[in-house]
Amino acid sequence: TAFVMGELLPFIQKQFGKTINGKKAFAGFSLGGLTAFDIAWHHSDIFDLVGVFSGSFWWRKKDLSKDYTDDDRILHEMVRETPDRPNLQFWLMTGTEDETADRNQNFIIVSIDDTVDVIKELMKKGYERPKDIFYYEMVGGKHNVPTWGQVLPKFLEWAFAK
C-alpha cells in the first residue's frame, strides 16, 4: 500500500496529470486483484473503481484442514466488518476454467463461488447490481494472462467509456 500510495500514484499523476472521465480505477489479476480490492476499499477517497480479474478471494485466515468455514475468508470478512460503505464501483471477473477446485462439492469452482460470495457481501452493504457491481463470467476463461488480456478491454470500456 505504501508503494502504491506514496510512489506509484504520484508518479502517474506527474507523468499523465489527469484522469479519464474524472475516474481513478485500480485493477489486478489473481492475488493482484485481491490487493487492488483491498487498497481501493481502504482508500475510496482516492479510487472510484475496482477491477478484479480471477481474484484470489479464497485467501483465508487458516488452512482448509483446520475447522475451516467460509467465514475465514479474509476479504469477505473485511467487507462484512467495515462499518461504512466506501463509495466505489466494482468490476469482477472469473473464468469457468480458472481452476478445478470445488471446496464445498457444489459443482461450482472455488473462484466463482468466492466471487459470487463477495458480490453477496457487497449487496448486503447496499451496493446494487448492475449500478455498482458488474460481474463477468468468461466461459472457457482460464487463470492466465491471455484470458485476462481478452477481457481487459471490457473492463476499460466499463470503467472509462461511461
Pin down the residues of each PLM region.
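Non-catalytic cap/lid and distal C-terminal segments of serine-dependent acyl enzymes
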Residues: 1-162
